[in-house]
Amino acid sequence: ITGAEGGAPDAPLVLVGAHPAARLRGDPRVRWFHSVNAGVDALLDGGWPAGVLLTRTVGRMGERIGQYALAWVLADCQGVPGHLARTAAPPGAANPPNWPRGQTALVYGTGHIGTAVASRLGAAGLHTVGVGRAEHAPGGPFDERITAGEDGPWLGRARFVVDALPLTDATRDFFADARLSALRGATFLNVGRGATVSLPALGRALAAGHVRGAVLDVLTDEPPAPGHPVWELPRTTLTSHSAGITAGTDITADFRACWEALRAGQAPELAVRVGRGY
């Protein structure tokens, strides 16, 4: 492994970072770029050089995001938002707890993160329905698996909807009026990518009561500036992209795993399928 500075002028380069330096894009010496992030949509904007391996860091992100989702689901079931509101205002009637067991959670995205979310929610007794690509194998922690085209009957039955989607052309504004207006009082959590949700549509669904409340860890514009429309959304909590923070140990462990796979002549599990977008 050599860096961009020093070494033989034509030595192959293996780079680790958030974005390759502009002057290295298109450099024929670059053979492999390992992203320190799980999301790679920004890297793929404008195309990716042919013949350059792109891998990503997942680490323990699924575990952390799964715990985050479970925390907010349980908080909702126990009426924590209402308790907090009553603490800051004159006392009112408390709502009874809404137990998680047997309630339905639609988890969009059945990769590392969605699988970890389903595992935690299932352990708490929720009925988890994974919404993913048709070629994904059945099984895992999901009670049921469907494709995006089959979610219609489930939208009105879901108590929780968790967005763990990557950002691709197919998932941009995936949650727009059609899906959000079909909900019947579900709580919506976004732990995937901000641009998979239309904020105007979410605002309309909140105002109409289709969405009971929203927890948004990711946004298209981060951090949102004062006056950004997201601050006006009712019954919405923002958590500043903190659900699945990547640690340095995650980066080194995943890079090492990719390196060992390549040494063994195998494709790394964390290799990005550029044509698919993740």
Swiss-Prot record:
Entry keyword set: NAD, Oxidoreductase
InterPro entries referenced in this protein's UniProt entry, alphabetically: D-isomer_DH_NAD-bd, NAD(P)-bd_dom_sf
Enzyme Commission no: 1.-.-.-
Residues where NAD(+) binds: 112-113, 191-193, 217, 241-244
GO molecular function: NAD binding; oxidoreductase activity
Active site positions, chain numbering: 193, 222, 241 (proton donor)
SUPFAM superfamilies (UniProt xref): NAD(P)-binding Rossmann-fold domains (SSF51735)
Keyword Lipid metabolism: no
Family: Belongs to the D-isomer specific 2-hydroxyacid dehydrogenase family.
Entry protein name: Uncharacterized protein in mprR 3'region
